[in-house]
Swiss-Prot record:
Substrate binds at D90, G91, S92, S93, Y195, K225. InterPro entries: FBPase_C_dom (IPR044015), FBPase_class-1 (IPR000146), FBPase_N (IPR033391), FBPtase (IPR028343), SBPase (IPR023079). Gene3D superfamilies: 3.40.190.80, Fructose-1,6-Bisphosphatase, subunit A, domain 1. This is Fructose-1,6-bisphosphatase class 1. GO terms for cellular component: cytoplasm. Keywords: Carbohydrate metabolism, Cytoplasm, Hydrolase, Magnesium, Metal-binding. Homotetramer. SUPFAM superfamilies: Carbohydrate phosphatase (SSF56655). The gene is fbp. The lineage of its organism: Archaea, Methanobacteriati, Methanobacteriota, Stenosarchaea group, Halobacteria. Mg(2+) 2 binds at D87, D90, E231. Signal peptide: none annotated. It comes from Halobacterium salinarum (strain ATCC 29341 / DSM 671 / R1). GO terms for molecular function: fructose 1,6-bisphosphate 1-phosphatase activity; magnesium ion binding.
Length: 287
């Protein structure tokens, strides 16, 4: 079924220039909220509709799910078919301030909700100064430059640097748990702060420079903010395949098995040593 995975990422790359070009015309806020309770921008719904149209007819894709949709959409019935889970426009709130955002995709080999262990590929498109796509599959992560026509140019393999350089953590500091705040104080003595409000842009900083990105469980939200199926598990797959580690505070995110489509989870990805230190500092999600 490798051709199905190829077709999905080809479709995402082909749509990327259109997503990027359409952002200026879809900056307005809607009156609606998505299934997770987030206020939607026109760009969120528009990007979701576009990516659904580009992927739902791919032979071998049986299910489509998105952060912007309440439920899974059945689009095929191929034997051994895949589920495609998308965050169509991660960091869409950055559109207003003209900062980076991206598209996150996970491909699972079973119906959703599905555990991290069922991921067969994951990737993201980053709409920054250039448009790039990072894809993890077959035990390898590679980065490509996406042209204005959707054509891709391979930029080579991606491997997480062994020496950490940057860190970025989400959430309000007053909402952090005491154990997590203590861990951050140790980290900030050695690493440089890089946090831009779009998860995928911050994760890409970690892939390039080494370090850690996370959105913790908080006093007011023990499960954190990021959606397991659409955000946490795909980025964990990418980072672990690139030689790093992931955690929800107790275990690898790839061992997480969501029971609800829009379930949230504390999320940490980065260099092995930093994630190991995090796990030691956070014995469970409530400390």
């Amino acid at each position: 079924m490798a051709d199905v995975i190829d077709a999905v990422f080809d479709a995402i790359a082909d749509a990327a220039p259109e997503v990027r070009a359409g952002l200026p015309d879809h900056r307005a806020t809607r009156d609606d909220q998505n299934a997770s309770g987030d206020t939607q921008l026109e760009a969120d719904v528009w990007a979701d509709d576009l990516l659904f149209d580009r992927t739902e007819s791919i032979e071998g894709v049986n299910w489509y799910a998105s952060e912007e949709r309440d439920a899974v959409v059945t689009v095929g019935d191929a034997e051994g078919g895949y589920a495609v889970a998308l965050d169509p426009l991660d960091g869409s709130s950055n559109v207003k301030s003209n900062n980076p955002c991206g598209t996150v995709v996970g491909i699972y080999d079973q119906p959703l909700p599905a555990p991290g262990s069922s991921l067969v590929a994951a990737g993201f498109v980053l709409y920054g100064p250039t448009t790039t796509m990072v894809v993890a599959r077959d035990d390898t992560v590679r980065e490509s430059l996406v042209s204005e026509t959707g054509a891709t140019t391979d930029l080579g393999p991606v491997e997480l640097p062994a020496d950490p350089t940057v860190y970025g953590f989400g959430g309000r500091v007053p909402d952090w748990t005491p154990a997590f705040e203590s861990f951050v104080r140790d980290v900030e003595d050695d690493l440089k702060l890089r946090y831009g409000g779009a998860m995928i842009a911050d994760v890409n900083q970690v892939l390039v420079y080494g370090g850690v990105f996370g959105y913790p469980g908080m006093e007011s939200a023990p499960d954190g903010k990021l959606r397991a199926q659409f955000e946490a598990l795909p980025i964990a797959y990418i980072v672990e395949t690139a030689g790093g580690a992931s955690s929800d505070g107790t275990q690898s995110l790839l061992d997480v098995a969501p029971t609800r489509l829009h379930e949230r989870t504390p999320t940490f990805v980065g260099t092995d040593d930093v994630i190991a230190a995090l796990d030691a500092a956070l014995p469970d999600h409530t400390n």
